[in-house]
Amino acid sequence: QALAVPCGKEDGGAFAYQPGKKGELVANNDASAAAVLGLLGKGMAVGDANAVKDPVCTKGDDLTAEQSAQNGAHYLAATLAASPYLEQPPMPGAEDAEPQPDFGNTADAVVSLAASGHKDKATASVKWLEKNAGTWAKQGGPAASAQLIFAAHATGADARDFGGTDLVKQLNATGPSPAATALPSPTPSGPQPSSGTESDDGGLGLWWLVGIGLLFGAGIGFLLSMRRKKQQP
């Protein structure tokens, strides 16, 4: 809870990336989405589940992991209620000084809301991603496609027709080819397995590729974060 913004304050329930120079906590969308999943003990491959009661922000210094996660979900739900997408500040030196849509963290927030039982709070965001994230996913490489696949999977959307884009095919096209699913050893009396490999849609191969994509994206995000810190006075 050391990085959680207390409920009742501005952006209450959110999580900070790290304390400021004076110990202040500033809400960070990336940290908030990740904290919700981490506190719930869930990974990115969250299954589609029915929504439960609305998230609440619980005050206190001795909260359970579940309560802290729900606080984070409360912040994400409130933020996405005001706008279907999260924003990111402009890069230092950028010509456009206005905040830009943050496709990646919006997708991650969708997964976190679904994981915490608030899929209904992410409905508008999923629709927004379907309509607007196509170009970003193509330019962002495997990590971007993977994030959208997870968001679709968590909310019951079709990853093979996400705003007209087959995200699975797009991810597979980045390579390497999906690994074939292991087949049982044949027995003299049993059926003989097919000699071919799984199609490019193979379940194990898909999630393996998704994992590789997210690791790649995490590395890029870390490098950008370090670059921003170096450019700050």
What is the role of each PLM region?
Residues 1-3, 76, 129, 171:
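Buried hydrophobic core positions in alpha-solenoid tandem helical repeats
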Residues 1-50, 61-71, 78, 82-121, ...:
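An alpha-helical repeat/solenoid feature that recognizes helix-turn-helix modules
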Residues 49-54, 122-134, 161-175:
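Alpha-helical repeat scaffolds
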Residues 54-60:
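Primarily N-terminal secretory
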